[in-house]
């Protein structure tokens, strides 16, 4: 039976790879960046350093993005793994690719990567490695910030309140109120306006016979 075919079938069926299975029983330990830090080239330092100070195979890409690529064990070709939101996501993607390419000779960013990540078998294609790296990075995506979530909820509530206010303002009832309170009360409005009119001047009743200065008689105040 072909060993490569068996490993490929195990990977496609979702069973743990031999690399991860051996790591579970603790038979051997992997090298990590803490035990074997990567070497830095001697000479003049670049003006703008983009490599992560701790994680291996991780570089910064503005603004606030992290990229990851790995080199093949016996060649100069590099495998691009993608761009990620956090450095830890890129570091996890690196560990998956390093395990798939180098096996136990891989230098990892996290000692628990063989146990926690689904690693493709050694000799897997570049596409399979990229797919596994993307899955590993997505598994370690940080949760959304609670404060941002609360801000979004408040903004949504404010928008709903403004929308309701606009709907109420456009209701026919409010349009009638704005047009002058014309709700069958025009007669009351006319009476109120009539009470504001000055009364007619006072005049003497000719039947009494009084003059201009005689105010003892009855005076007709209103004339209809």
Curated annotation (Swiss-Prot):
It is found in: Nucleus. This is Dehydration-responsive element-binding protein 1G. PROSITE patterns: AP2_ERF. Residues 1-46 are annotated as: Disordered. InterPro entries: AP2/ERF_dom, AP2/ERF_dom_sf, DNA-bd_dom_sf, DRE1A-I. One of its GO terms (cellular component) is nucleus. SUPFAM superfamilies: DNA-binding domain. Transcriptional activator that binds specifically to the DNA sequence 5'-[AG]CCGAC-3'. Binding to the C-repeat/DRE element mediates high salinity- and dehydration-inducible transcription. Keywords: Activator, DNA-binding, Nucleus, Stress response, Transcription, Transcription regulation. Belongs to the AP2/ERF transcription factor family. ERF subfamily. Residues 54-111 bind DNA. One of its GO terms (molecular function) is DNA binding. Disulfide bonds: none annotated. The keyword Metal-binding does not apply. Residues 1-16 have a biased composition (Polar residues). PANTHER family: DEHYDRATION-RESPONSIVE ELEMENT-BINDING PROTEIN 1D (PTHR31839:SF2). It comes from Oryza sativa subsp. indica. It comes from the Eukaryota.
């Amino acid at each position: 039976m072909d060993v490569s075919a068996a490993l490929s079938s195990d990977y496609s069926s979702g069973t743990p790879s031999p690399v991860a299975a051996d790591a579970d029983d603790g038979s051997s330990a992997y090298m990590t960046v803490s035990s074997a830090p990567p070497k830095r080239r001697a000479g003049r330092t670049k003006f703008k350093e983009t490599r992560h100070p701790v994680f291996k195979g991780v570089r910064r890409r503005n603004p606030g993005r992290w990229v990851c690529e790995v080199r093949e064990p016996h060649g100069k070709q590099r495998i691009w793994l993608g761009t990620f939101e956090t450095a830890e996501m890129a570091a996890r993607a690196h560990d998956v690719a390093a395990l798939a390419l180098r096996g136990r000779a891989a230098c990892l960013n996290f000692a628990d990567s063989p146990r926690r990540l689904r690693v493709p078998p050694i000799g897997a294609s570049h596409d399979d490695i990229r797919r596994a790296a993307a899955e590993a990075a997505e598994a370690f995506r940080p949760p959304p910030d609670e404060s941002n979530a609360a801000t979004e909820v408040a903004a949504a509530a404010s928008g709903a309140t403004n929308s309701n206010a606009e709907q109420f303002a456009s209701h026919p009832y409010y349009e009638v109120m704005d047009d002058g309170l014309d709700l069958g009360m025009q007669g009351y409005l006319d009476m109120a306006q009539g009470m504001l009119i000055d009364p007619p001047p006072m005049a003497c009743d000719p039947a009494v016979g009084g003059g201009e200065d005689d105010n003892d008689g009855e005076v007709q105040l209103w004339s209809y």
